[in-house]
Structure formats: structure tokens, C-alpha cells
């Protein structure tokens, strides 16, 4: 096998593919990359993730009479996801496979901004009737502020670090997973709602695929916890992941924010909460009761003015149809659901809980609610 190809663009980016012979091994296949702007390539696909950064690296694949092996070093400078900075990412990986393709060995290290955050060591054995894996993964002070870039919009930002270690053993299709995860000074903040929860620093054990929560605490702004007990079983297929979790909290301050910028919700909010989630991922039972306590004083700001809300409000409110006109019948809009979810929830507002609603961002039009009541909601599937 021989190759010699070089592609460059105005001296800024380079793609090079070539072979060489060093006298010891058969021809090796080499690849070099430099100055590749990811956004210029990913824009070619409408399904590509919103990743940006400058890609560079090199890779080599080689073989002899006993092994095929390869190693690569890849770097993405100023990597971002959805316009949120992740950092400078480095991946160093090595892979080897026996000539009969019965055993594969892997080793990988990942760094973020020059600090090691993850390692992988393992092998796969295909010489048995069912493929067996032996894999060790370690997470070392992964900065959650950078990982927040991958969270969906509206879920807030995280701070602190994540540590962990996992061992995967047994059949490749359904390995046994054991290890633990541990947050270090971690907090989840949703700035637009003045909400913050601090994660417990204790280990979260994973035993045979079960992620266990033993009185695990998420603390509100006043230090009072929401306590989780139960487990999530990851030992099955994705749609068969089974959960059995109960959560309970008393006088937890879930909102503690000040009026500023385009914040939608601010003030102080205190709740009692009881909840439970049980069942498979595609067939869940959820129960929850949330009491908004006295002492709560919240202000919600409509970011759209009341004038804009009323414009066109009378359009499409009433539509007259002729039921005998079969030519205008539309197809059923109710598609079969891939999963079922049963929900039973109650929201209780206690006396002396105050709510203010600013109908315009400047606060000139507003409503104040000082009352009590209960709202129930249920869903069968």
C-alpha cells in the first residue's frame, strides 16, 4: 500500500496522507491535520452538532505478522459547543488488534486546557462465544463549568468538579458496571430563575449497573436539603432503564434571586416537596406534591409586553366548520406514543405566599396575588 496526498488552503489548513517504510514494519499509513476549522466542515450537514474550534493532529496505522495497531494525537483549540466555550481539548489514543481479530486493546487519555480529565484502559475478547469486555474508565476533576456547554438551553450552568471511576466487565452487550461518581463543590444554577442547588459531596455508588442514592442531598439556598433515596438501574437497554427514586424536602429555598437584567423570576421561594419516580424509562409512574410556603415572595417578569400579547389574540379563537364536508377532514394528529407516563401531581399554595406578575418588562403593568389554593394534575398515559 502506498499513498502520498497533500491538500492545503492558503497555508492555513492542511490535510496530508502518506505511507512510509522504516525497515522494521510494513508500510504505515500516516495522516496529518492542521488548521481545520470545524465549523467550515460541519456546515455541510444539517444534522451536525454545533461544534466550533480548530482541529489539528496526526495518526498512524501500522501492522506486522502479529498485530495491527494505531495511535493518534488530536487537538481542538478553542472548542465550543452551541457558542459556549469548552476549552482546548487533547486526545491521545492507542489501539491494537491481533492479526486474527480476536482481541482488541485500547488506551486513551483526554486533557482539557492541559489538565488530564479522563483515562480509558481496556480490551475486548472476541475469541469466546460471546464478546467479553474489560474496561476501566477514570474521571479526574472534570470541570463542570465547561461541561455545561453540552446541557440543553434553559437547564442552567454548573460549577465545581466531577470525579469518578467505572469498571465494565463481562459480555459486551450487557456488561457489569461497578464504580462510583463524586461531585466536588458542585452547584447547578439557573440564572433566569434565580435558582441554585448544591450537590452532595458524598460518593454515588454504582453496583452491578445500579446507581444508588442513599439519602443523597441537593441543598437549597438556605442549606435545607432535598433528599433522594433509591436507584436507577442501567444494566438493561436504554428504553428498559428502571428507576425507583423517592425525594423529600422541607422548607427548601429553591429561589433566591435579585432583580437584574432579563431575569424572569426573582425573590425568595420556599417549598415542601414529596415525590417519587418508578418504572421503566418507557413506562414511568410519577407522583409529586409541592407546597409553596408562607414567606415566599416571588416576582415573575413577562419579557413580552402586554400590548404584544394582546395583538392578534382574537385571531383563530373561533373557527366554524361544516362536519358534512368530508373533503376538509384532516388526518388524525394524534400519533402513537413510544412511551407511557402516568403522572399524579399537586401544587399547594399556603397562606401568606405572595406572587407578583409584571405584565411588561418595565414593571408598569403588574398584578399581585396573595392567596391560597391547590392545583391538581393527573395523566394516565
Q: What is each residue range found by the language model?
A:
Residues 1-165, 173-273, 280-374, 380-381:
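Interface amphipathic segments
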Amino acid at each position: 500500500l502506498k499513498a502520498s496526498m497533500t491538500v492545503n488552503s492558503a497555508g492555513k489548513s492542511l490535510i496530508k496522507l502518506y505511507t512510509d517504510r522504516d525497515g522494521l514494519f510494513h508500510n504505515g499509513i500516516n495522516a496529518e491535520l492542521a488548521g481545520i476549522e470545524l465549523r467550515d466542515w460541519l456546515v455541510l450537514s444539517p444534522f451536525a452538532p454545533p461544534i466550533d474550534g480548530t482541529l489539528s493532529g496526526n495518526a498512524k496505522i501500522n501492522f506486522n505478522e502479529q498485530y495491527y495497531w494505531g495511535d493518534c494525537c488530536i487537538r481542538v483549540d478553542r472548542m465550543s459547543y452551541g457558542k459556549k466555550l469548552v476549552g482546548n481539548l487533547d486526545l491521545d489514543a492507542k489501539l491494537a488488534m491481533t492479526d486474527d481479530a480476536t482481541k482488541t486493546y485500547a488506551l486513551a487519555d483526554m486533557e482539557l486546557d492541559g489538565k488530564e480529565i479522563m483515562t480509558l484502559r481496556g480490551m475486548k475478547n472476541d475469541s469466546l462465544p460471546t464478546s467479553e469486555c474489560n474496561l476501566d474508565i477514570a474521571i479526574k476533576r472534570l470541570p463542570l463549568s465547561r461541561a455545561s456547554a453540552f446541557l440543553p438551553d434553559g437547564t442552567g450552568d454548573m460549577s465545581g468538579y466531577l470525579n469518578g471511576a467505572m469498571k465494565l466487565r463481562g459480555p459486551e452487550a450487557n456488561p457489569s458496571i461497578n464504580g462510583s461518581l463524586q461531585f466536588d463543590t458542585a452547584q447547578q444554577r439557573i440564572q433566569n430563575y434565580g435558582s441554585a442547588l448544591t450537590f452532595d459531596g458524598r460518593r454515588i455508588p454504582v453496583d452491578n449497573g445500579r446507581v444508588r442514592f442513599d439519602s443523597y442531598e441537593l441543598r437549597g439556598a438556605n442549606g435545607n436539603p432535598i433528599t433522594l433515596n433509591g436507584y436507577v438501574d442501567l444494566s438493561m437497554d436504554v428504553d428498559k432503564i428502571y428507576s425507583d427514586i423517592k425525594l423529600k424536602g422541607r422548607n427548601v429555598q429553591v429561589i433566591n434571586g435579585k432583580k437584574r437584567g432579563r431575569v424572569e423570576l426573582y425573590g425568595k421561594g420556599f417549598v415542601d416537596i414529596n415525590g417519587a419516580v418508578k418504572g421503566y424509562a418507557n413506562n414511568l409512574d410519577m407522583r409529586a406534591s409541592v407546597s409553596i410556603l408562607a414567606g415566599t415572595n416571588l416576582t415573575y417578569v413577562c419579557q413580552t409586553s402586554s400590548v404584544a400579547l394582546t395583538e392578534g389574540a382574537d385571531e383563530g379563537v373561533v373557527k366554524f366548520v361544516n362536519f358534512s364536508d368530508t373533503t376538509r377532514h384532516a388526518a388524525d394528529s394524534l400519533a402513537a406514543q413510544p412511551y407511557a407516563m402516568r403522572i399524579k401531581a399537586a401544587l399547594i399554595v399556603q397562606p401568606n405566599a405572595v406572587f407578583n406578575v409584571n405584565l411588561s418588562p418595565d414593571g408598569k403593568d403588574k398584578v399581585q396575588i396573595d392567596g391560597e389554593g391547590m392545583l391538581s394534575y393527573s395523566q394516565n398515559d
